[in-house]
Amino acid sequence: MAKTKAGGSTKNGRDSAGRRLGQKIGDGQFALTGSIIYRQRGTRIYPGKNVGIGNDDSLFALVDGIVKFQKIRKRKYATVVMAK
């Protein structure tokens, strides 16, 4: 005999919240030093000039300037062109 009735579906119904990944500053927009440009899992986009990479693979600006995304040999790069 079953101790409880068949109620398996009520024990499912959970999901984790979205991780808010993706682009935070668009191409051509101004970024301040330390501001996050792109949040990612793994290196979907690689750091270019004046861009650092964090422990969680987030890309951030090392200088104040304009964000540029470019594709070089099948790899996407994020760079920051310094403001004058």
From Swiss-Prot:
GO terms for biological process: translation. The keyword Thylakoid does not apply. GO terms for molecular function: structural constituent of ribosome. Disulfide bonds: none annotated. Keywords: Ribonucleoprotein, Ribosomal protein. Belongs to the bacterial ribosomal protein bL27 family. This is Large ribosomal subunit protein bL27. It comes from Mesomycoplasma hyopneumoniae (strain 232).
